Swiss-Prot record:
GO terms for biological process: cell differentiation; negative regulation of dauer larval development; negative regulation of miRNA transcription; regulation of development, heterochronic. It comes from the Eukaryota. This is Period protein homolog lin-42. It comes from Caenorhabditis elegans. The gene is lin-42. Residues 487-497 have a biased composition (Polar residues). SUPFAM superfamilies: PYP-like sensor domain (PAS domain).
């Protein structure tokens, strides 16, 4: 079907099936629209855009070809200069495109149903021209509508008036300085297709003398931790035909919160003037014209500098804000807010005191405020000078000291606040002092101090006695221990043991170990055995408890010259136990003394 307004179109149509009675309808497109390619972009199915393009005489030709070979099935040309032999049936349409355009069309056919692609097409005169391709893909074929791209600065364009309209577009580049995105709407202004720039260096379309502007912008981005910064000067860009465009650029960066490095930089370029040179930025540059961009060797050097800046961690927040809050911290240390001068600060305090005071106190406050205001007027100049010094970059490590006038003013304010801290009632102030109501004071003598100290000591003593008594009352007392008497003891046995004398104390100057042993029953004393149980019992001593041999001696109990039974010495080394003399008190006592060899 021929679009409206183009009756002189030339058609080349071929029928795929030779049998006209059995037409084969085209298979419906069952694929859904997928992710768009970059730079290709999806376009709406509405015909409004197509009609606008047709009325604007941008329509060049339409073509239907097979996939993936690109054999032309039908074509129709609408623009002047396109003859019938430009696209004939059986020709290869993909051969009319540059290599990048061929790969993008085949990739878009596998991903979506409709796609908008920007590519350069070979014109009838053999020149490559940037065009817009509206593609509709089916299972084994594709229909392409080719629209011409025109310069935004061309006088033939109907949407360009005498007054220039400001245009803004966005570019993005990674930490390797490679462009990852550029608005396709910038094509009429730059003449560069997204396929010409994506993957290439940022400096590929920057005017060579303005490279330092890009470098300084990256340094400012690093210092501001990725916040928006403006270029120090207008950035000049080079169009496709070699013309120069002047634009105002703002930069912003994404900083990785873990590595603190800039990973992506976004630039917003605002073209605000006509190009310097040929206004047809879409056309190819004339032959023999030298490019205005940096040579590859110099461009690589600047790219390395930009990579170094972006791969360096940005300064921390505390370090960045140290200089920003330097002056405010100084003012806070001086005792008044940073954004209010000293005179206004004192006036505010005096106003609060006057409002909160009584009628009789207002006169006193006014007098004190007048004295403080005089010092405040002299301190305003000194405060401004100190703030000016504090806002400037610090040249020395020490802070500037406070001036004498400022210290005097602050002291007046403190005295004023101190005098108003404990206001007294007017009745008490006017009442005369009566000495009769108050007793005479006791003179401060040594006796008075002694009595005073004794009185406090008695109070402390009584207090501690009460505390100890309260603690003793809280603790429950345990009942006295009761010693049970053996069952087989008679009353006579109990009385006999009660009448026994206590054991004698050990002699002084010697180490003794006293051990009590159970006593024998009185009924067993009539036994024929004359030795006591203590004499018949052997006491084995484990050698593991003593590091050296030990011998037993009873020299402390026996009189001089006395020996044990049998004439054996206690230190003779025999295993027989020692024999003690039988006395009423020694029958219940065993005394041992340790002596090392």
């Amino acid at each position: 079907m021929e679009p409206a307004g183009h009756s002189s179109a030339t058609h080349n149509i071929v029928v795929p099936n030779a049998n006209p009675t059995q037409p084969q309808p085209l298979a419906p497109a069952m694929r859904e629209e997928g992710a768009t390619l970059s730079p290709p972009n999806t376009w709406s199915s509405s015909s409004v855009e197509f009609l606008d393009d047709a009325d604007d005489n941008r329509l060049l030709f339409t073509c239907t070809f097979t996939l993936p070979h690109g054999t032309v099935l039908s074509s129709a040309t609408y623009a002047d200069g396109f003859h019938e032999q430009y696209l004939t049936i059986g020709d290869n349409f993909l051969a009319r495109l540059e290599p990048k355009g061929q790969s993008f069309i085949l990739s878009a056919a596998a991903a979506s149903v409709k796609q908008r692609i920007f590519a350069r097409v070979t014109m009838p005169d053999g020149a490559l021209r940037a065009c817009e391709l509206l593609c509709e893909f089916e299972t084994d074929r594709a229909k392409i509508t080719v629209l011409a791209l025109r310069s935004a600065f061309s006088l033939q364009a109907s949407h360009v008036s005498s007054n220039f309209h400001v245009f803004t577009f966005i570019t993005k580049h990674s930490s390797t300085c490679a462009l990852t995105h550029i608005d396709y709407a910038s094509i009429p202004y730059l003449g560069l297709l997204p396929t010409d720039l994506i993957g290439k260096s940022l400096l590929a379309f920057v005017y060579s003398p303005d490279v330092h502007v890009v470098r300084q912008a990256h340094i400012d981005l690093h210092n501001s931790r990725g916040k928006i910064v403006k270029s120090i000067a207008d950035l000049r860009l080079v169009a496709h035909n070699g013309s120069i465009l002047r634009c105002q650029t703002e930069w912003s960066a994404y900083v990785n919160p873990w590595t603190r490095k800039m990973e992506l930089v976004v630039a917003r370029h605002r073209i605000c003037s006509l190009p310097i040179g040929d206004s047809d930025v879409i056309s190819s540059p004339p032959p023999g014209i030298q490019s205005n961009t940096l040579p590859p060797v110099m461009a690589k050097t600047f790219e390395d500098e930009l990579r170094t800046i972006m791969n360096k961690p940005v300064p921390s927040t505390s370090r960045h804000s140290h200089h920003h809050h330097h002056s405010s911290l100084k003012d806070q240390n001086q005792g008044f807010p940073a954004n209010i001068d000293l005179g206004a600060y004192i006036d505010k305090i005096v106003e609060q005191l006057v409002v909160n005071s009584t009628a009789q106190q207002q006169q006193k406050v006014a007098v004190a405020a007048a004295a403080a205001a005089q010092a405040a007027q002299a301190a305003v100049v000194a405060t401004a000078q100190i703030r000016k010094v504090a806002s400037a970059p610090p040249t020395t490590s020490t802070d500037p000291p406070l001036s004498y006038t400022q210290i005097n003013c602050l002291e007046n304010v403190h005295r004023l606040l101190k005098s108003q801290s404990r206001p007294e009632s007017p009745a008490k102030q006017d009442e005369p002092f009566d000495e009769k109501k108050y007793p005479p004071q006791t003179p401060l003598t040594r006796e008075a101090l002694t009595l005073h100290t004794k009185r406090f000591e008695d109070e402390y003593k009584d207090t501690w006695c009460r505390r100890l008594k309260r603690l003793s009352d809280d603790v429950p007392s345990s009942p006295p221990a009761k010693r049970t008497t053996p069952i087989h003891w008679t009353s006579s046995s109990q009385n006999h043991y009660r009448t026994m004398a206590p054991a004698p104390p050990p002699p002084p100057g010697k180490n003794y170990q006293i051990t009590y042993t159970p006593l024998d029953d009185l009924t067993d004393q009539k036994s024929t055995n004359t030795k006591s149980d203590v004499e018949n019992v052997a006491y084995p001593i484990s050698g593991s408890k003593f590091s050296t041999p030990m011998r037993l001696s009873i020299d402390g109990l026996l009189p001089r010259g006395a020996t044990s039974t049998g004439g054996a010495s206690p230190t003779s080394g025999t295993n027989s136990p020692p024999v003690f003399p039988k006395t009423s008190s020694s029958s219940s006592l065993l005394m041992l003394r340790d002596s090392q060899n």
